[in-house]
Amino acid sequence: ALNTSLGLGEIDAVRATIDEDEIGDFLPHVRSIIAYNAESKVVETMRMNGVLISQIAPNGGIISGSSSVVQLDAWNWEDAVISYDQGIHLNWPSPYSRSGYSYYRGPSVIKKSEKYESNIEEIKNFFDSSKAYLNEPNPNPVSLPYKAMSSVFSGRSTVFLHANYEKQIKDGVKFLQEQKIKNIVVVGGTNSLQ
């Protein structure tokens, strides 16, 4: 099972058991493997149905954090891990916004997002700030989000680009190539051919 929050949440009604979505927009330093619960009832159910390996990925924000690959037959996260922090998850903003269905207005309407360009600029600023931070010989104060980007810029980590529309995919891949990111994987792409 790829790109799943399996083992990061147990009971949806109890916020304290949900570790898949942290607060904040740029969280490349958040490691999903640390929160992985190998003894989750959901993990046991998946294993009984033949799923033996899974990529545990965080959700939410613009950069959600790093994912790891685990085997589902383990006592704890240290035993479960196959590949640590293999990449970060970048949720590319949608170029479209949707108005909700209303009894008075009728069905929802899809239109161009007014915030699309400013959201992309925010991502660009984060990448530029990360590079500037990493080029400092002794950065002070320490910034964990910027520091976590070093493996992305060096090519040791993959960027999992979450995008569904054709424009999102093209813009996201173009941006990452301009940033000289070597390892890019598109996640989703459900509306890419429309």
Regions found by a protein language model. Give the residues of each.
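Polyanionic/metal-chelating signatures
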Residues: 42, 47-183
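Short gly/pro/ser/thr-enriched loop/turn and capping motifs at secondary-structure boundaries
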Residues: 6-8, 61-64, 192-193
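Metal-associated gating/positioning segment near the N- to mid-region
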Residues: 1-49, 54-57
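Catalytic core of soluble alpha/beta enzymes
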Residues: 170, 190-194
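Short, glycine/acidic-rich beta->alpha junctions
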Residues: 34-38, 62, 190-191
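Short internal beta-strands
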Residues: 185-189
